[in-house]
């Protein structure tokens, strides 16, 4: 029998301690991983609701189990809000993750062995855009395009490769690209070779929802996103389309269920609905505008301190810092900043001489720090601290600088908590 006052603390102290330690880590560290954000207490409340108990195979009004009347309300609410948010005609809120959403799109539109053309992981793409270690590079014949020496997508390279390999599907989108993608140009190339255009907007979905980054829906056949990055919701996936082709919509439905997934996670869909409601509110646009302002402010500091920023700037929530000129590695920078309670991720940069697990750069993103209240002055100061640590790498004062920086980080984290009590 269950009781409402059951807790993890008195039942599983080892697990409870790990949860408490993670809570403290998040409060005392500055989070700059571009793919991470803080979910609101309302989102977490929905994730912990009784919907976690409900099996609901199928879709609203067409379930394989009884007792789904309230699950239907939740899912339809999430669908309708996502349609309004992005201007979509078709929405599927069931994918458990962005990768599963992408797998469903491939399964709906093309067959095993067909050719796809996507951005090279080393140039800012994603594993699921055709990387050889991913299902997308194993099941399908993947051809990769990249960026120029200036850090910009080479659309002529995309076009030439499309003409050469005649892909059935072109993937646009990224995990580490700081500029604006020309969705219309990508569709023009896709139409020229008779390919589908599939856009993965996971990293910039929040900016798109706020009207601060071009919406790919008018140009793409199908669009996917995660719901936890700039959107700031639960960890999950989403498929959208406005192509007007009912056959594609039907294929997408069946490719999610039953082809790739069984029962949807109704508690996560409820959390997605909460997230979409928040994204429709006026203050959401202000938040996303501040995300971009903060990223631009940090870029200027890094450049002033002599560090190269890939593509020389940013038009979204992230940017890459290259250490090739300094002879540093992303791995060393990641570790040193981590000791100072600043969390980033090492990242490959164009013409990177280092191995993928070492790299010559870091990726920096501002959704999380902006969510906890950092303004432009705060992030300029933060970028300066980061440069102090990077400047000291390998020098006698390295540990001293790291210790001093950590004290500054703890102070600002105390002033700007993630979840104020």
UniProtKB/Swiss-Prot annotation:
Its cofactor is pyridoxal 5'-phosphate. Catalyzes the reversible interconversion of serine and glycine with tetrahydrofolate (THF) serving as the one-carbon carrier. This reaction serves as the major source of one-carbon groups required for the biosynthesis of purines, thymidylate, methionine, and other important biomolecules. Also exhibits THF-independent aldolase activity toward beta-hydroxyamino acids, producing glycine and aldehydes, via a retro-aldol mechanism. The modification N6-(pyridoxal phosphate)lysine is found at residue 229. One of its GO terms (biological process) is tetrahydrofolate interconversion. One of its GO terms (molecular function) is glycine hydroxymethyltransferase activity. The record marks 228 as: Plays an important role in substrate specificity. This is Serine hydroxymethyltransferase. Its EC number is 2.1.2.1. (6S)-5,6,7,8-tetrahydrofolate binds at residues 121, 125-127. It is found in: Cytoplasm. Disulfide bonds: none annotated.
């Amino acid at each position: 029998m269950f009781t409402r006052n059951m807790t993890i603390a008195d039942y599983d102290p080892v697990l409870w301690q790990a949860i408490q330690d993670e809570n403290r880590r998040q409060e005392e560290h500055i989070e700059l991983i571009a793919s991470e954000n803080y979910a609101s207490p309302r989102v977490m409340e929905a994730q912990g609701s009784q919907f976690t108990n409900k099996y609901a195979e199928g879709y609203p009004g067409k379930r394989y189990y009884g007792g789904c009347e309230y699950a239907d309300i939740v899912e339809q609410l999430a669908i309708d809000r996502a349609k309004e948010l992005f201007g979509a005609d078709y929405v599927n809120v069931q994918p458990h993750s962005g990768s599963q959403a992408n797998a469903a799109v491939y399964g709906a539109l093309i067959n095993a062995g067909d050719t796809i053309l996507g951005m090279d992981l080393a140039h800012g793409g994603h594993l699921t855009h055709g990387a050889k270690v991913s299902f997308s590079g194993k099941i399908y014949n993947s051809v990769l395009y990249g960026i120029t020496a200036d850090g910009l997508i080479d659309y002529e390279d995309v076009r030439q490769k499309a003409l050469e390999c005649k892909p059935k599907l072109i993937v646009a989108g990224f995990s580490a690209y700081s500029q604006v993608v020309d969705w219309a140009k990508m569709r023009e190339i896709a139409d020229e070779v008779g390919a589908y255009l599939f856009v993965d907007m996971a990293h910039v979905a929040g900016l798109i929802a706020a009207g601060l980054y071009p919406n790919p829906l008018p140009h793409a056949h199908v669009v996917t996103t995660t719901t936890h990055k700039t959107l700031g919701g639960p960890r999950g996936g989403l498929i959208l389309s406005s192509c007007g082709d009912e056959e594609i919509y039907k294929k997408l439905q069946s490719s999610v269920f039953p082809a790739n997934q069984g029962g949807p996670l109704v508690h996560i869909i409820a959390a997605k609905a909460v997230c979409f409601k928040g994204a429709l509110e006026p203050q959401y646009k202000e938040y996303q505008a501040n995300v971009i302002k903060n990223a631009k402010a940090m870029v200027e500091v890094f450049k002033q301190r002599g560090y190269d920023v890939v593509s020389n700037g940013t038009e979204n929530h992230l940017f890459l810092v290259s250490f090739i000129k300094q002879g540093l590695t992303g791995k060393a920078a990641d570790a040193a900043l981590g000791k100072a309670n600043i969390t980033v991720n090492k990242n490959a940069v164009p013409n990177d001489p280092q191995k993928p697990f070492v790299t010559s750069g870091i990726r920096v993103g501002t959704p999380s720090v902006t969510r906890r209240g950092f303004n432009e002055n705060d992030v300029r100061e933060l970028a300066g601290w980061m440069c102090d640590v990077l400047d000291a790498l390998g020098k006698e004062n390295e540990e001293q600088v790291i210790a001093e920086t950590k004290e500054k980080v703890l102070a600002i984290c105390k002033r700007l908590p993630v979840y104020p009590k």
